[in-house]
Structure formats: C-alpha cells, structure tokens
Amino acid sequence: MEKQNKMKYYHNNRCRKSREGLAFLESKNIHPEIINYLENRISKDDLIDLLKKLNVTAAELIRKSESVYKENIRGKNLSNDQLVDWMIREPKLIERPILVNNELAEIGRPKENFLKIIT
C-alpha cells in the first residue's frame, strides 16, 4: 500500500503573507498540516531537509529584515551550517510561508509560487 504524505505548511499566524498564503491554498481546497514553527521549533535535521527540498542555501532562506539578522549576522562570513544554527536558535529568521508537498517545497512569496508544487 502506497503511503500518502500530507502537505505541510510552515506558518506564522502573525505574518500577513503567511495568512494570505494559507487562504490561497484553502481557496484551492488544499488543507495542509499547519506547522507553527515559532511555537513548535523545527529540528536541525528537518531544517536541512527543508533546504534540500527548497533547493536553496541557508543564506537564501534567512530573513534579512529581522533585527536578529542585522545585529548578529549581516556582514559576517558565516557558513551554511552556522546560518542553520542561527535559524534553529531564532526561528523567526526562517523565511515564510513554506509549503512542502512530499519531496518538493516552495516559499510562498508570492503565494502563487505554491502552484508549482500543487498542480
């Protein structure tokens, strides 16, 4: 019997773009498992797996507008692993929203990016 994976949505309810992305998916009758990653912290292994599914580096996933980034990371030559560690410690540094569909993932900026992995 084939195992069916449910889509996962890395969500921050306080973020307008994240709420808009979820509403967009629901308008397409897609109801993913919602992961409030600020409350239920993502593990390092899961974040590394997410980077692979997104096909991006940690530097590409990090939110550069956050004060934590500006005060601690900007201008430093940090490795991918060091940036992952920062995102684990400070999950608000992780760009959002993210939809995962099996082995594929997309950042919903713009929300229409999700169409690449749901159609």
Kindly give the residue locations of the regions a language model identified:
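Alpha-helical protein-protein interaction elements
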Residues: M1-E2, R16, N29, L61, ...
